[in-house]
């Protein structure tokens, strides 16, 4: 998932998004502006729907190797990650591969679209950018099948964001590969049409609808109709939103957390899933104990 702030029109007008309710001043205090929450402000715990927060590592271990690469997934497995997220695209000849971007430009230095290339053509361009890229000279864009096999080797749960699967054959291939996972996969997507299609095809696992606006009653009704959970951008969710989702039987996934304090805030708020990136700080070992 790439975090890019894009101005959007909220579905319903309302207060500015916040991760915690605004503190109501008492007669003895002077009203103060709303501030970014800290672990000290959020004191009341709210449990996740299943009783435990699950942590999803974003695009593999990006501190060890380039994002969405086999070395990054293998490093995640060796570090004990339980859930690992990646992005899925269909090539021009119908093979499902792992890549966040629609082009090879950023990771491989080749300005060509994945959807217009064959799988064999894509494999001609190694990944040359990202963490420690020079240490992996033969690092290629993985196939979805390779990613699933890696998750199976390390007992990780696949978390798959569908970026682009254009054909019926591609969707059938996706369903087949999901069935090869030893763990129950989680599938996420911005497009509710794609998620509803998976339900039509018989996928009974967890589906998450990615949203970049505040939660609304209409959104909740759509989720209940197709048995979807919500994957919310961190800046557009509050503790009351999470409570409301839980009351409607919906789970909330938060993206994207890049430090321990932010992760701790949303854990206390009752988030069911937290999508995070590893960070190179001394607190990383402390955080690993909560995964």
Which residues make up each language-model segment?
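Phosphate-group recognition and catalysis centered on beta-loop-alpha active-site segments
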Residues: 2-291
């Amino acid at each position: 998932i790439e975090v890019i702030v894009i101005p959007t029109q909220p579905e319903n007008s309302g207060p500015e998004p916040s991760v915690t309710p605004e503190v109501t001043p008492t007669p003895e205090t002077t009203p103060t502006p709303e501030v970014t929450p800290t672990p000290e402000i959020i004191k009341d715990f709210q449990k996740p729907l299943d009783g435990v927060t699950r942590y999803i590592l974003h695009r593999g271990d990006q501190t060890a190797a380039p994002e969405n690469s086999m070395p990054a997934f293998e490093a995640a497995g060796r570090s004990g990650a339980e859930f690992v997220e990646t992005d899925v695209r269909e090539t021009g000849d119908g093979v499902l591969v792992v890549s966040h971007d629609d082009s090879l430009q950023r990771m491989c230095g080749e300005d060509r679209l994945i959807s217009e290339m064959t799988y064999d053509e894509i494999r001609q361009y190694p990944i040359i950018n990202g963490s420690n890229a020079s240490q992996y000279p033969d690092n290629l864009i993985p196939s979805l099948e390779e990613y699933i096999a890696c998750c199976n080797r390390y007992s990780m749960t696949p978390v798959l964001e569908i970026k682009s699967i254009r054909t019926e054959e591609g969707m059938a291939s996706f369903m087949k590969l999901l069935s090869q996972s030893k763990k129950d996969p989680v599938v996420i997507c911005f497009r509710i049409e794609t998620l509803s299609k998976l339900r039509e095809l018989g996928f009974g696992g967890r589906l998450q609808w990615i949203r970049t606006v505040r939660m609304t009653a209409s959104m909740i009704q759509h989720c209940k109709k197709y048995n979807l959970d919500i994957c919310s951008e961190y800046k557009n969710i509050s503790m009351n939103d999470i409570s409301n989702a839980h009351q409607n039987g919906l789970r909330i996934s938060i993206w994207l957390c890049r430090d321990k304090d932010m992760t701790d805030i949303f854990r206390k708020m009752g988030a069911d899933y937290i999508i995070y990136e590893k960070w190179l700080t001394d607190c990383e070992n402390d955080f690993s104990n909560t995964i």
